[in-house]
């Protein structure tokens, strides 16, 4: 079990998929949202949560005031858990896309997101992560000023962000490393 830390749904317990996911710890989630809230007001934001797992990161954003959250998860069992967790949080504005992240972001987006959170399995290669980051820009999922949060293993090298992203911060929390970057666009 994990829980929503703060906001309208603070304290509500969330289910976690039985296998195949690595939920972000409460400590890391709190640090991540502190770093985000120091840079952007979550109120009214559109958030894209990639490799959503239990949905805890995206639902935390919703609880803290995000207007709309899209949670992308390829595993059908995990997507079902996310749907149940949306019911538990009982806030409007959450949508689940049960599909592979690479397939979703390789197509055009109907909107640019203010925040993108990507927590891929540690086994996902750096090249695959960079490809996803590149597709986010090319297909208009992100725009100038979008903040991108990436969770990776603290044992792996820091991400080499593709053109169009400016790294802001990277910090290790035990086994996890949180990296933040801002999108400045390919035309800058």
Which functions belong to the PLM regions below?
Residues 1-188:
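Class I S-adenosyl-L-methionine-dependent methyltransferase catalytic core
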